[in-house]
């Protein structure tokens, strides 16, 4: 996921010329995958718990591979957007299930600290290295080699999942998917409200429709949680003091790409 986020900036300018797009069309093609990722952000954790982390990681990495190849060979912006949507959704799943895997399989405090510290080193390293590599690629080759690089990395993830992760027998536990789906829909709708607000505020159809969807999703989420004894999505971690610095750190790295879009404007 960090690889895509770090290298995405270098797709915009080549896309404009290769597919004869306007700048707004290229930006929209990058916004839609983010919305799709938000829809799955809570469902991904439930998938790992329901089907097992090993199987979920393998399927997500394979789907990521297919999406990256679709971006690489896409002849028009609609297929590029579809490929980026697949990459975004499967990448979100990979990230969340990987964190869940670390948390469930490493119980020793010292080992867990080392594992999460290593994971914390990877993100800034990728955000430093990938823009340089992506920029170098676009200097002498087509932008389509960037998603090919994503596909190659997905192959390594599939192989690592098969080789290093052993299947774990767990008692089958029924998971409800309604509340995670509605929570993701709420986040995606709120993002659309914020994204379209400059177009005219509440007087704009592009604002009040997603706002209505967000309200309906929120009401449905509360109703779904109250209907089941053990909902799949819990808000308990948000009450922990340790959550705040983690959320701040998670936001800092993607903000690096904001400077690129500022220069585009």
Per-region residue spans from a language model:
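12-transmembrane solute porter fold
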Residues: 1-33, 37-45, 54-57, 61-62, ...
């Amino acid at each position: 996921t960090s690889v895509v986020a770090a290298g995405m900036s270098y797709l915009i300018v080549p896309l404009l010329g290769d597919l004869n797009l306007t700048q707004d069309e290229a930006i929209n093609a990058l916004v839609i995958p983010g919305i799709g990722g938000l829809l799955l952000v809570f469902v991904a954790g439930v998938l790992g718990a329901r089907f097992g982390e090993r199987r979920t990681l393998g399927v997500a990495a394979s789907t990521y591979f297919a999406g990256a190849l679709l971006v690489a060979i896409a002849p028009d912006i609609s297929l590029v957007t579809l490929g980026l949507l697949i990459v975004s959704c499967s990448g979100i799943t990979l990230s969340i299930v990987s964190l869940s895997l670390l948390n469930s399989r490493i119980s020793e405090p010292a080992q867990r600290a080392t594992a999460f510290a290593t994971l914390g080193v990877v993100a800034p390293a990728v955000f430093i290295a990938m823009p340089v590599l992506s920029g170098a690629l676009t200097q002498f080759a087509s932008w389509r080699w960037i998603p090919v690089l994503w596909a190659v990395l997905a192959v390594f993830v599939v192989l690592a999942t098969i080789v290093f992760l052993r299947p774990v027998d767990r008692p089958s536990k029924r998971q409800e998917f309604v509340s995670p789906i509605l929570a993701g829909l709420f986040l995606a709708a709120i993002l659309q409200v914020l994204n379209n607000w400059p177009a005219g505020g509440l007087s704009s159809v592009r604002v009040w429709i997603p706002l209505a969807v967000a309200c309906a999703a929120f009401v449905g989420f509360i109703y779904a949680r109250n209907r089941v004894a053990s909902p799949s999505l819990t808000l308990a971690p948000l009450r922990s003091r340790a959550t705040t610095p983690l959320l701040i750190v998670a936001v800092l790295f993607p903000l690096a790409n904001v400077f690129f879009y500022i220069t585009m404007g």
